[in-house]
Amino acid sequence: MRRSIKKVAAGLLATMMIGTMLTGCGGGNKKDSGSSKKETSEINIGFSQVGAESDWRVANTKSMKSALTAKNGFKLSFADAQQKQENQTKAVREFITQGVDVIAIAPVTETGWETVLKEAKKADIPVITVDRQIKTSDDSLITAWVGSDFKKEGVKAAEWLIKEKGKEKGDVNIAVLQGTIGSSAEIGRTKGFKEGIKDQKNFKIIASQTGEFTQAKGQEVMESFLKQNKDIDVVVAQNDNMAFGAIDALKAAGKTPGKDVTIISFDAIKAALKKVQSGEINAEFECNPLHGPRVAELAKKIMKGEKVDIPAGTTIFGVTVTDNYDIDIY
């Protein structure tokens, strides 16, 4: 998705760019997925969504539903897992029983999918993973993945923080609000950030706990962090809703978010960008939720028996408080 960003005059930080990956899984040995299926006038697709735990997820669901319409040649069966993997497994089995043409999954966690994916493969139903990834011992169980490079997002966040605070003489105390443990977003952002700061001896992660990608839990965990240690210099929230919760907790504790405590967040939903402009969030890294059109395109290619090997995706931005941009384009 193209972004039009207006820069303020001279002396501002350059916008850091990170890339999404829209790629077929399994390296270069892609199979001609769907080649045994007949092309039909309507593609029956079952989509198992994580839930509605965040504003990003709501936007992702809207994008999928908007793209997978009858007008566009699809019949969509939608299942909300309410953040429970067992609900997703049940939904996928129902899709298999229904005989859908394609299954799309935005998984709660990376692991625990082997059995049900083998069932889908046995039924000759291709599977597309959306946003988060799934780890299996057999790459052929997943036909394609549409999502972001979460590890690179974490690395870029670390690079920004080093640029801002790397030369400080004292310790920089960091609190991390993790997403759902075991999700590829949590794994990638955690790993990327830790690897990015490993050579900064004065950077100390003094607290780290899941906020489950929700605002309420993010606030609860941040309140707990503040009770345990008031000397927190930086909060890294692995999505915007948790950042909002952290901001509320900091304000309640008499601290000024963005000034007393540096806030780094991910997703770049519109409400978060407003907080970048107001100075409450210092750095924001976008993770585009609009995967629907790409999933629709992939599903059509798969049903035609075409190879789905997509090497690159759109360019997205890391924006900071020093940027001036038109929020209404988001």
State the predicted function of each range.
Residues 1-44, 69-70, 118-125, 329-330:
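Short, low-complexity disordered leader/linker segments with a strong preference
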Residues 43, 177-181, 185, 196, ...:
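Hinge/cleft segment of the Venus flytrap/periplasmic-binding protein
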Residues 43-71, 76-90, 94, 98-100, ...:
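Extracytoplasmic "Venus flytrap"
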Residues 45, 88, 145-172, 217-219, ...:
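Hydrophobic alpha-helical segments within soluble ligand-binding/sensing domains
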Residues 56-70, 74, 153-157, 184-203, ...:
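Short, solvent-exposed amphipathic alpha-helices that sit
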Residues 78-80, 136-162, 208, 278-289:
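Short beta-strand elements at the ligand-binding edges of bilobed clamshell
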Residues 96, 102-122, 193, 207, ...:
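Hydrophobic alpha-helical
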Residues 111, 115-152, 173, 269-277, ...:
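Flexible loop/hinge segments that line or gate small-molecule binding clefts
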